[in-house]
């Protein structure tokens, strides 16, 4: 069954194995997640749990948010996500989820919002090749041809300059290297999307190797 938890990306470090090999890991502080709601087929048409992470200031929460959180005997949350494919019998409204739901060696998917890069050209945004940088060349870092004249328009999906980053990104099949239950930290192998202190969702890997 699927399981997941929300956390905050703290940054990267390295962990040394028994044979002295260094493994780059990302440290995720999962804190205390609270089950805000259980959804079932009869009421909602599908099965899922809704979890909340990180308390929101009371003056920033509206009345529906306060009422929704009160049913779980908790404060309104900044980040709320749904996780499908879970066994509803294992969860209760108001239950706290911590780092110990994962174990070392498990494979997980980590989803987050990628770093925003602003308005970027085709070379940085789409990994296009540049033209010759010689004096005689009249093409260096432009987007290149946008298609034939005949359609009288530019087709959708053309690789052009524009806003880069700030997208929902999921990195699949990352190994859990270490779980620190005292400090509620999960260390996963490799990098995960987003800047430091951003919210990420750690869930059971969908495509297990």
UniProtKB/Swiss-Prot annotation:
SUPFAM superfamilies: Translation proteins. PROSITE patterns: RIBOSOMAL_L3. Keywords: Ribonucleoprotein, Ribosomal protein, RNA-binding, rRNA-binding. One of its GO terms (cellular component) is cytosolic large ribosomal subunit. It comes from the Bacteria. GO terms for biological process: translation. GO terms for molecular function: rRNA binding; structural constituent of ribosome. HAMAP family: Ribosomal_uL3_B (MF_01325_B). One of the primary rRNA binding proteins, it binds directly near the 3'-end of the 23S rRNA, where it nucleates assembly of the 50S subunit. Belongs to the universal ribosomal protein uL3 family. Part of the 50S ribosomal subunit. Forms a cluster with proteins L14 and L19. This is Large ribosomal subunit protein uL3. The gene is rplC.
